Amino acid sequence: MEISISVSNKRNRYIIFNVNDNWVFCDESISTVLGISLLEYKQRFKNICKVFDTKYGIIINDKISDEEVVERFKQEFASELVILKMEGCELI
């Protein structure tokens, strides 16, 4: 299983994940992969940067760089990502 992060460079940036070649907008797919509830995921994501929720997921409403978002994500979800790595998953 592979999980990658990319960030669109539009007015508002979406964090988009590729989970097993399926692109998802920060929705239940990624929270399921991380093994946490969608509500917990969204609450913890708010620790990373300013966000607001849409039915499609979380839109970043912040001036931080794409790289900083990815780094903050890795720090916030470090314990979950360690578990994923143990199961052969990579976060790019």
What are these language model-derived features?
Residues 89-92:
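Short acidic DE-rich linear segments
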Residues 22-84:
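Acidic, low-complexity, intrinsically disordered interaction modules
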Residues 3-32:
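N-terminal acidic leader/helix
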